[in-house]
Regions:
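A short, glycine/small-residue-rich beta-strand->loop->alpha-helix junction that serves as a flexible
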Residues: 21-34
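Donor-nucleotide binding loops and adjacent catalytic segments primarily
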Residues: 37, 200-276
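Conserved nucleotide-sugar phosphate-binding/catalytic loop shared by glycosyltransferases and other
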Residues: 42-43, 48-96
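Conserved nucleotide-sugar donor-binding subdomain of glycosyltransferases
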Residues: 83-116, 123-124
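A donor-sugar binding/catalytic signature common to diverse glycosyltransferases
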Residues: 116-120, 269-309
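Active-site-proximal region of nucleotide-activated glycan assembly enzymes
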Residues: 135-196
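Nucleotide-sugar donor-binding patch of glycosyltransferase catalytic domains
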Residues: 155, 252, 261-262, 295-341
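C-terminal amphipathic helix plus adjacent low-complexity
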Residues: 333-370
Length: 370
């Protein structure tokens, strides 16, 4: 029924029963959680996984019997969030899903009796933990909006949107026992029980050495963003493109553009060997670019303030640039800035996922005494 593994090979900490929730909107949460879950299982903990939407599909391919739940989703059009359509769709589907959610929790109480909850921005497991008096640990990048201070220059022009999204983040997972916030930038922490840790990296990325190449890697998950193809074609630069044409089963070449079906291994190889990267505001891609020292032109999804904030910190650090949209001039300025970005990125260092895993091990150990 649920993903359950027995306790084997545990190190210094006692085996625990952990309820782990993953929000389904955006693949970054699922990719990060896969890495953390692998580590938890390797430490001998028993883990029940509850996830929604695409996260459930992704995790079910790696872990047995992931339990699917209803979660929030976002509707996009022309690289923008459509707020009204998103709201009504979530209300309609959420009400219909509520009885099944409650049945799942009753089953969980009877069959598993978790000792601690870990939430990657997932509300249902958080609520379960709070209503059952369990320690709740938050692991995600979204909490940087709520639990850190951001200066006025960084937020210029998005102040109102920032306040709204910060309020949403604050209301979604309040009063956790600990917040482990993944980030490649380090603004002042204002929230209690908050620790900034480096981004979670896929082991495949850590194991792939960065090499100097000449191609641009382009990763765009919104299929409504076809206008980008014309700009890239006009640049004359070799571009390896993922995401724009999801129906592909093999490479499709048009002049200097190579459209590729998504394959994780080949994507990582193209990322590690790229001269530079163009992507949306994905925190996962942004973090991997920084780790591999690849300059990034980030084009956040309209209405996603968290992506805008991350992209502005990226630009402030000199690791890349950000733009609302891409035209020939924006692309030319970015290409000209690549050497300078490479110089700034050369000083960035991260020891894999050690800092996060050490922090999580301490939190799990201390949760026993709470």
């Amino acid at each position: 029924m649920f993903a359950l593994q027995s306790a084997r090979g545990l190190g210094h900490a006692a085996a625990m029963r952990i309820l782990y929730g993953v929000v389904g909107e955006g693949m970054g949460h699922a990719i990060r959680s896969r890495v953390v879950l692998d580590w938890l299982f390797a430490q001998g903990h028993s883990v029940e996984i509850m996830a929604s939407s695409r996260a459930a599909d992704f995790l079910a391919r790696r872990f047995p019997e992931v339990h699917r739940i209803h979660g929030l989703h976002i509707i996009y059009d022309e690289n923008r969030v459509r707020k009204s359509r998103t709201l009504w769709s979530n209300l309609r589907e959420g009400v219909a899903a509520l009885p099944a959610q409650l049945r799942s929790y009753f089953e969980l109480v009877r069959d598993f009796a978790p000792e601690v909850v870990i939430s990657d921005f997932e509300s249902w497991v958080y609520l379960y933990g709070k209503t059952h008096g369990l320690p709740v640990i938050s692991i995600d990048n979204m909490q940087v909006l709520n639990r850190c201070k951001h200066d006025g220059d960084l937020l210029r022009g998005i102040e109102r949107q920032f306040r709204l999204q910060r309020a949403f983040v604050r209301a979604k997972l309040p009063f956790c026992d600990q917040y482990l916030v993944t980030s490649f930038f380090y603004p002042p922490v204002t929230g209690k029980r908050t620790t900034l840790v480096p981004p979670v990296l896929r082991p495949e990325v850590v194991a792939t050495p960065a090499t100097p190449g000449e191609h641009l890697l382009v990763y765009q998950t919104s299929e409504d963003h076809e206008a980008l193809s014309g700009v890239l074609a006009g640049s004359g630069l070799e571009c390896r493109i993922y995401g724009l044409r999801r129906d592909l089963t093999e490479d499709h070449v048009e002049g200097n553009l190579c459209f590729r079906p998504f394959d994780e291994r080949r994507f990582i190889a193209d990322l590690a060997s790229a001269r530079a990267v163009i992507s949306g505001g994905s925190f996962t891609v942004m973090s991997e670019c920084v780790y591999l020292h690849k300059p990034l032109l980030a084009v956040p999804v309209g209405g996603q303030v968290e992506q805008v904030v991350n992209a502005r910190y990226l630009q402030r650090a000199g690791y890349g640039q950000t733009a609302d949209s891409i035209d020939a001039d924006v692309l030319a300025r970015f290409v000209a800035a690549v050497p300078g970005c490479e110089e700034r990125l050369a000083s960035y260092a991260q020891d894999g996922n050690r800092v996060l895993f050490d922090a999580l091990a301490r939190e799990l150990e201390s949760s026993v005494t709470r």
